[in-house]
Amino acid sequence: FLPLIAGLLGKLF
């Protein structure tokens, strides 16, 4: 799980 994706998910959700 890439930190970039985690950041995007954190922004959306």
Swiss-Prot record:
Keyword Secreted listed: yes
Record GO cellular component, one term: extracellular region
Tissue expr: Expressed by the skin glands.
List of residues that carry Phenylalanine amide: 13
Assigned keywords, A-Z: Amidation, Amphibian defense peptide, Cytolysis, Hemolysis, Secreted
Protein role: Shows hemolytic activity.
Name under which the protein is recorded: Hemolytic protein B9
Species of provenance: Pelophylax lessonae
